[in-house]
Amino acid sequence: MSSIRTMVRGAYDIQKNRIQNGNRLVGNFKVKLGLPPSTKENKLDKEGKIILTNLRNSYKLLTEGVANFPRQANFKGDEVISDYTELCLVDNYLQLEGQEKNHFRRLGHTLEEYPIYTDYLEGIRGVGPAMAGVIISEIDITQAEYPSSLWKYAGLDVASDGQGRSRRKEHLVKKEYVDKKGKTEERDSITFNPFLKTKLTGVLGASFIKQPADKCKYREIYDGYKHRLENMDAHKEKSKGHRHNMAIRYMIKVFLVDLYNAWRPLEGLAVAPTYSEAKLGKTHKKAA
């Protein structure tokens, strides 16, 4: 499992590097074109995407039919890529983009060795190989005795103050660590896996709500829960964004319960009912 985790983390490291290079590249050409820089660092705005498309097209024209990368002495630019340095910057970005695609493609092949992927995750709309890789590599299902164990590990449990788990000071716990001198000390630490939480709520959640509700159970759950919040006096005053985040959180918690119920039997492990099933007799329909 450590090997696939290294592969998944490596893929996302390449992706992060590619995004950073893309932002710098677009920023450079925005300055050249006299456009204001983007305010978002983690993704491109509409103008940025158009610039990248134009750069790709220009790069293709300038390098088409050339066996080796052009040398500076022989370089002749166009109205988009006008000097050799710009050509090198675009080439670097496209190389990273290619590495990223290859890495995620190989990850998809690797996942075929895992029954939880071939028998379950692969068939769920909105869960691609990259997200399946995150789930399989970050979660040790043998350590999740209850569905709530997954919620806690993913940072989706409720803290002692009744609020959703976060990095707030009141949600931190004391954990021991060994300092540089080999001495055991204590420090305030989070209780969850931040990488997993970010991918589940930020990436998987967004993927689910892009699916049609009649073909994705989790989109249907999101819509239903958000509608309930909008019609509850206790939540009417909350912003749309707050209710959206609450619905995403709820949807992912249901997904984790379904994941638990599918994964544990595949590993020959006992399955415990959720609190709502054990105490209230409520059940969720299976994912499709």
Question: Where do the protein language model's features map onto the residues?
Answer:
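Phosphate-backbone recognition surface of nucleic-acid-processing proteins
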Residues: 120-121, 134-245, 249, 262
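Short, hydrophobic/amphipathic alpha-helical patches that form generic packing surfaces
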Residues: 5-23, 27, 133-138, 198-206, ...
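A glycine-rich phosphate-binding loop feature that marks nucleotide/adenosyl-phosphate handling sites
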Residues: 126, 167-175, 275-280
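Extended non-catalytic scaffold regions that mediate assembly and binding
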Residues: 39-48, 182, 188-189, 284
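Eukaryote-specific, cytoplasm-facing alpha-helical/coiled-coil scaffolding segments in long proteins
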Residues: 40, 161, 226-232, 277-288
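Basic, amphipathic alpha-helical segments enriched in Lys/Arg and hydrophobic/aromatic residues
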Residues: 239-275, 284-287
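Coiled-coil termination/hinge junctions
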Residues: 102-141
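Long, charge-rich intrinsically disordered scaffolds of nucleic-acid metabolism proteins
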Residues: 1-110
